[in-house]
C-alpha cells in the first residue's frame, strides 16, 4: 500500500476547493495560511505552539487582517475589470454592513484599508449607527442607514449629514418617510433618501425568504407610488437619491441574482421616467461564500459563481437598461459583508478525549456457561461474511433487542448485557467494512458509518463560537491542523464541552455531498491534537451566546510580510468573573460569601485552616481564569 501523501489530505478535506488561495498544507503536514501573495505562509501548528509559550491557550480565534485587505482589493479589482469591459460610466461603492462582524478591530481594519476604494459602512440599528458615525471614514465614503428608525435615529443621521457625512436614510416602511420629512424640515437639512423596494424576485439557499413577497422589509409597488406622491407633494423629489433591494444572504444561484437585477433595473428606469433622478442603486448583499468548495448551486453552503461573475452581471444589467432608455448609469452600491470577512478568521481548539463504541476482543472466547443469546451472537460474528451479512445484520438486531428487553425485566445480568453490546458493535463494524467495498450495498447499511463514528470531545462551545452550525446547520470547513502527512485512522463527530446534547458538529464537508463524520487521527499520549474551523469571520463572533457561561475565546491578530509573521495583538478571552457579572453575580460578593462559609466550616471542624485557605485560593484563581478548560 502506498504511503499517505499531503495531496491525499488536500483532497480528503477539499482544502483547495474552499481554501481558495489562502489555505493549504505544507511539507510538515501542517495547515498553512497565506494571507498575501507577497507574504509568507503562516504554519498554524507552529503559531499555536508559540502562543502556548505566551500563555495564550486554546480555544482561540486567529484573525488575519491581511486577508480582509485582500478581499477588499479583490472586490474592487473585479469592479474595475467589469467597468472597463461594459463601458460603465458611474462609480461603484463597496459598503460593509457592520452587523456581519461589529468587532472594533475588524471594522477599523476594513475602513483603514478601504479608504482608497471609497469603502463605506452600513448601520441596521440605532446602536450600530452610533458606532458607524464615530468611525473615521473617508469624506467621500457612504453611510447607509437601514433597519427600523425612530425620531432619535433619524435626528442623529440628519445632524451627522449636516456636519458633512454622506448619509443615506433608506426607507423600510412608509411611516419612516413621513418621519424623515418632518425631522428634516425641523433641522433645516435636505435629506438623502433611499427607498427599499420589495422585489418579487428572491434569492436561493437558507435565506431565500429574505427576499420576494414574504420579505420582512421594503415597499411594494403600490406603497412605492404612495411614497413618490408624498415626496412630490412635499417638494422633495430631489431628495430621493437611492433605491435599494436585498434578496437574501448567501445566494447560491447566480440565475436568481440576474433575475433580481433585471427587475430592479426597471424600477430605476421607471423612476427616471417619472422625473425622479435617482443616482444610486444599492443591490444589497447576497454575494455568497463557497464554504464547502464544491462551487455548486445545489448546496446551501456553496455558490455556483465567482465574485467577478457577480460583479459582471450587476454592472452589465444596469448599464444595458440605462443605455436602452437613454438615462445615466447609476452608481452601484454593494453590501457584501460575508464575502469580505468570512475568510479572515480561524477558530482553533484542542481535542480533550475520545469515546468509542465497545468492541469484542478478537482473542476473547465466550465461557461455556455464557447466556444462550451471547453464544448465538458470537456465532454470527464468528461466521460473518459477505454472502450472509444482511441476514446476520437482521439476526444481530433481533438478539440485541431481545437482550435489552430481558435486562429491563431483570432476567439477564449486567455482564451479559455488556457482552451483547460488544459483540453487536463488532458485527456492525465488520458489516460496515464489507458494505463499504461493495458497489451496490443494501440501503439498510447506509447509516452505519454515522452510527459507528467516534466522539471527539473538544475544548470549545458551539453556541459561543459557531452559533450558525447549531441554529441553521451551516457547514464550515473543519480539519486537523497537524499530522496531515498521516492517513486518518478514525472517523468522528465533534462534541463541545457544554452540558447540552445539541453541542456537537455532525455535518462535514465531503467530496460527495455532506458527511456525518470527519476523518481524524487517533490521539497520541502527551501530544495535543488541534482542530480548526475555517471561514468563521462572518456573523459567528457577534451571534455567539454564553450557554453554560462559556465566554469569548482568546483572540489573536496575525499580520504577515515577505520575511515572516507578526503577532500584532492578543485579546484575552473572558474570565469566569466577567461572564458571571453579565448575569448579575458580583464576583466580590461571591468571594465574601465563600469566605464566611469557609470560616464557619473551619470553626465547626469540618475542614482544617489549611484546607480552607486552599479552597479559597482555588476559588479566587478560578474566578479570574479562563472560562474554558485549561
Curated annotation (Swiss-Prot):
Pfam families: Arg_decarb_HB, Arg_decarbox_C, Orn_Arg_deC_N. The keyword Glycosyltransferase does not apply. Gene3D superfamilies: 1.10.287.3440, 1.20.58.930, Alanine racemase (3.20.20.10), Lyase, Ornithine Decarboxylase, Chain A, domain 1 (2.40.37.10). Substrate binds at residues 281-291. InterPro entries: Ala_racemase/Decarboxylase_C (IPR009006), Arg_decarb_HB (IPR040634), Arg_decarbox_C (IPR041128), Arg_decrbxlase (IPR002985), De-COase2_CS (IPR022657), De-COase2_N (IPR022644), De-COase2_pyr-phos_BS (IPR022653), Orn/DAP/Arg_de-COase (IPR000183). The modification N6-(pyridoxal phosphate)lysine is found at residue 99. Its EC number is 4.1.1.19. Coiled coil: none annotated. Catalyzes the biosynthesis of agmatine from arginine. This is Biosynthetic arginine decarboxylase. It comes from Bacteroides fragilis (strain ATCC 25285 / DSM 2151 / CCUG 4856 / JCM 11019 / LMG 10263 / NCTC 9343 / Onslow / VPI 2553 / EN-2). The gene is speA.
Amino acid at each position: 500500500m502506498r504511503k499517505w501523501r499531503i495531496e491525499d489530505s488536500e483532497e480528503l478535506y477539499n482544502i483547495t476547493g474552499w481554501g481558495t488561495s489562502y489555505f493549504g498544507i505544507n511539507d510538515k503536514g501542517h495547515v498553512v495560511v497565506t494571507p498575501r501573495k507577497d507574504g509568507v505562509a503562516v504554519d498554524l501548528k507552529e503559531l499555536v505552539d508559540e502562543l502556548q509559550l505566551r500563555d495564550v491557550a486554546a480555544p482561540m480565534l486567529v484573525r488575519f487582517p491581511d486577508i480582509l485587505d485582500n478581499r477588499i482589493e479583490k472586490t474592487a479589482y473585479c469592479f474595475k475589470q467589469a467597468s472597463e469591459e461594459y463601458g460603465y460610466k458611474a462609480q461603484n461603492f463597496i459598503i460593509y454592513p457592520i452587523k456581519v462582524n461589529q468587532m472594533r478591530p475588524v471594522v477599523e481594519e476594513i475602513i483603514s484599508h478601504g479608504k482608497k476604494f471609497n469603502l463605506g459602512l452600513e448601520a441596521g440599528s440605532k446602536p450600530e449607527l452610533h458606532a458607524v458615525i464615530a468611525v473615521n471614514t473617508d469624506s467621500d465614503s457612504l453611510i447607509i442607514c437601514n433597519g427600523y428608525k425612530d425620531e432619535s435615529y433619524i435626528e442623529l443621521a440628519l445632524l451627522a449629514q449636516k456636519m458633512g457625512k454622506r448619509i443615506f436614510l433608506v426607507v423600510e416602511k412608509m411611516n419612516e418617510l413621513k418621519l424623515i420629512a418632518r425631522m428634516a424640515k425641523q433641522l433645516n437639512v435636505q435629506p438623502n433618501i433611499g427607498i427599499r423596494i420589495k422585489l418579487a424576485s428572491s434569492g436561493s439557499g437558507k435565506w431565500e425568504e429574505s427576499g420576494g413577497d414574504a420579505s420582512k422589509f421594503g415597499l411594494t409597488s403600490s406603497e412605492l407610488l404612495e411614497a413618490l406622491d408624498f415626496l412630490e407633494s412635499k417638494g422633495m423629489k430631489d431628495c430621493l437619491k437611492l433605491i435599494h433591494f436585498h434578496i437574501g444572504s448567501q445566494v447560491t444561484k447566480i440565475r436568481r441574482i440576474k433575475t433580481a437585477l433585471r427587475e430592479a433595473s426597471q424600477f430605476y428606469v421607471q423612476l427616471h421616467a417619472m422625473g425622479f433622478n435617482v443616482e444610486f442603486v444599492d443591490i444589497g448583499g447576497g454575494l455568497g461564500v463557497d464554504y464547502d468548495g464544491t462551487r455548486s448551486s445545489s448546496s446551501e453552503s456553496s455558490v455556483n459563481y465567482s465574485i467577478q461573475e457577480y460583479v459582471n452581471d450587476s454592472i452589465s444589467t444596469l448599464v444595458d437598461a440605462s443605455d436602452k432608455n437613454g438615462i445615466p448609469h447609476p452608481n452601484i452600491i454593494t453590501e457584501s459583508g460575508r464575502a469580505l470577512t468570512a475568510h479572515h478568521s480561524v477558530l482553533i481548539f484542542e481535542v480533550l478525549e475520545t469515546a468509542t463504541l465497545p468492541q469484542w476482543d478478537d482473542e476473547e472466547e465466550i465461557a461455556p456457561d455464557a447466556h444462550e443469546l451471547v453464544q448465538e451472537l458470537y456465532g454470527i460474528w464468528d461466521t460473518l461474511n459477505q454472502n450472509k451479512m444482511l441476514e446476520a445484520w437482521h439476526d444481530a438486531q433481533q438478539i440485541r433487542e431481545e437482550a435489552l428487553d430481558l435486562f429491563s425485566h431483570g432476567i439477564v445480568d449486567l455482564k451479559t448485557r455488556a457482552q451483547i453490546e460488544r459483540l453487536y458493535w463488532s458485527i456492525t463494524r465488520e458489516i460496515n467494512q464489507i458494505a463499504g467495498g461493495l458497489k451496490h450495498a443494501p440501503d439498510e447499511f447506509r447509516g452505519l458509518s454515522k452510527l459507528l463514528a467516534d466522539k471527539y470531545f473538544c475544548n470549545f462551545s458551539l453556541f459561543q463560537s459557531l452559533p450558525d452550525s447549531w441554529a441553521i446547520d451551516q457547514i464550515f470547513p473543519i480539519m486537523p491542523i497537524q499530522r496531515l502527512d498521516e492517513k486518518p485512522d478514525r472517523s468522528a463527530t465533534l462534541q463541545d464541552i457544554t452540558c447540552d446534547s445539541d453541542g456537537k458538529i455532525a455535518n462535514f464537508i465531503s467530496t460527495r455531498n455532506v458527511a456525518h463524520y470527519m476523518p481524524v487521527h487517533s490521539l497520541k499520549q502527551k501530544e495535543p491534537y488541534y482542530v480548526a474551523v475555517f471561514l468563521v469571520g462572518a456573523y459567528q463572533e457577534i451571534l455567539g451566546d454564553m450557554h453554560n457561561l462559556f465566554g469569548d475565546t482568546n483572540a489573536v491578530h496575525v499580520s504577515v510580510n515577505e520575511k515572516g509573521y507578526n503577532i500584532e495583538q492578543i485579546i484575552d478571552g473572558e474570565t469566569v468573573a466577567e461572564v458571571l457579572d453579565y448575569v448579575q453575580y458580583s464576583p466580590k460578593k461571591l468571594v465574601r460569601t465563600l469566605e464566611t462559609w469557609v470560616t464557619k466550616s473551619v470553626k465547626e471542624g469540618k475542614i482544617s485552616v489549611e484546607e480552607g485557605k486552599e479552597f479559597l485560593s482555588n476559588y479566587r484563581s478560578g474566578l479570574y481564569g479562563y472560562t474554558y478548560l485549561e
